[in-house]
């Protein structure tokens, strides 16, 4: 079920009225659903733009059309028009299932480690232009990672590994015993913090 607040409905209705196109609605879809890059897309939709298999949700003065393939990813979504602390108003979409769900405890350790790396660790590292890739997960629970982007050659990679990544993986994936770095940091060509200046 998708919830759309009264404020969001009023916001959309005013935008649609301004367009002046009979039958215009709003189409909601999931982009890259089930991945860390997943996002929700809202766009105007004229009747001719619709494929006919969308789910239609009647709103106050317009219809919200949900692309059929996106319906499972949008279950539980909330669309609102909120006032931020700065006084600005902003449309917000919360879609808790859009990036997929964490693997079950019965999933392999490799699947669970990869999910945490892709959905929790890499989004944080991306703020520095960095990322990590899982190279191997041993039977003993040792995770071997390769740093890339701004983390490749970074003078703070050891701190990131021990205080950030290892803590996160050991706390979120039962069975992980250690996290090791397999990166040749001397070959990094654009580190966020050069190794010789991290002291």
Swiss-Prot record:
The keyword Ribosomal protein does not apply. Keywords: 4Fe-4S, Iron, Iron-sulfur, Metal-binding. One of its GO terms (molecular function) is iron ion binding. SUPFAM superfamilies: Fe-S cluster assembly (FSCA) domain-like (SSF117916), HesB-like domain (SSF89360). InterPro entries: Fe/S_biogenesis_protein_NfuA, FSCA_dom_sf, HesB-like_dom_sf, NIF_FeS_clus_asmbl_NifU_C. Involved in iron-sulfur cluster biogenesis. Binds a 4Fe-4S cluster, can transfer this cluster to apoproteins, and thereby intervenes in the maturation of Fe/S proteins. Could also act as a scaffold/chaperone for damaged Fe/S proteins. Homodimer. This is Fe/S biogenesis protein NfuA. It comes from Xanthomonas axonopodis pv. citri (strain 306). The gene is nfuA.
């Amino acid at each position: 079920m998708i919830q759309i607040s009264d404020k969001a409905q009023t916001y959309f209705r005013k935008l649609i009225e301004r367009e002046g196109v009979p039958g215009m609605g709003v189409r909601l879809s999931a982009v890259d659903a089930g991945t860390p890059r997943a996002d929700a897309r809202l766009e105007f939709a004229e009747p001719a733009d619709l494929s006919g298999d969308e789910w239609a949700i009647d709103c106050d003065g317009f219809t919200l059309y949900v692309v059929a393939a996106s319906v499972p990813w949008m279950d539980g979504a909330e669309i609102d028009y909120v006032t931020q602390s700065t006084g600005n108003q902003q449309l917000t979409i919360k879609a808790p299932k859009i990036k997929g769900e964490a693997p079950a405890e019965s999933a392999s350790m490799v699947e669970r480690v990869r999910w945490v790396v892709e959905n929790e660790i890499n989004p944080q590292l991306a703020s520095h232009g960095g990322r990590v890739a899982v190279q191997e997960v041993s039977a003993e629970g040792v995770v071997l990672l390769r740093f890339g982007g701004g983390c490749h050659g970074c003078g703070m990679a050891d701190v990131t590994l021990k205080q950030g990544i290892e803590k996160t993986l050991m706390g979120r994936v039962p069975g992980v015993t250690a996290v090791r770095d397999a990166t040749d940091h001397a070959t990094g060509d654009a580190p966020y913090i050069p190794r010789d200046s991290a002291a």
